Amino acid sequence: MSKRDYMNTSVQEPPLDYSFKSVQMIQDLISEEPRTGLRPVKYSKSGKSLTQSLWLNNNVLNDLKDFNQVVSQLLQHPENLAWIDLSFNDLTTIDPVLTTFFNLSVLYLHGNSIHRLGEVNKLAVLPRLRSLTLHGNPIEEEKGYRQYVLCNLPRITTFDFSGVTKADRSTAEVWKRMNIKPKKVRIKQDVL
């Protein structure tokens, strides 16, 4: 199967589903069997999954150490990973490893322990990210939570399972002007 054929078919492929497996470390996925759904996951001749979706929700992960290496062992084309579900784990930060998947369009992080709103800024480098969930994290209690996320991730079209409207964008822009101070540019003065 060519890469082009893969890109056309794998979007409809079922996810590689490791949800509800009590996984504590990413490395444990290598020895764990994925859950089976209504449709079977397809595999390449080398034994790697031909999907673009990885579900790791409802486990006990507290970090993503070795995530790239493990994903490379599980997926035929890890660079095409488009959907990662890490909801309902014990993550306290948004690991920068997630920003290496430039085709990522759906990222579920709800129900974790992320407590710094600034963590969201890491995701700004993902050009295709359109759907993000963060509700159920301590950051949800921060004043201006929704506006902050929408200001920093302007390409998001769905946030916390709600569509982003023009009114949301407008409110976020007003919030940004009122709450985020522009960085001062220092002018270097020549001393004679």
From Swiss-Prot:
Chief localization: cytoplasm
PANTHER family recorded: LEUCINE-RICH REPEAT-CONTAINING PROTEIN 51
UniProt entry keywords in alphabetical sequence: Cytoplasm, Leucine-rich repeat, Repeat
SUPFAM superfamilies: Outer arm dynein light chain 1
LRR repeats: 49-71, 80-101, 103-124
TM helices/strands, residue ranges: none
PROSITE patterns: LRR
Name by which UniProt lists this protein: Leucine-rich repeat-containing protein 51
Family matches, as InterPro entries: Leu-rich_rpt (IPR001611), LRR_dom_sf (IPR032675)
Domain LRRCT: 137-175
Domain of life of the native organism: Eukaryota
GO cellular component, one term: axoneme
Taxonomic source organism: Rattus norvegicus
Localization of this protein: Cytoplasm
Upper classification of the organism: Eukaryota, Metazoa, Chordata, Craniata, Vertebrata
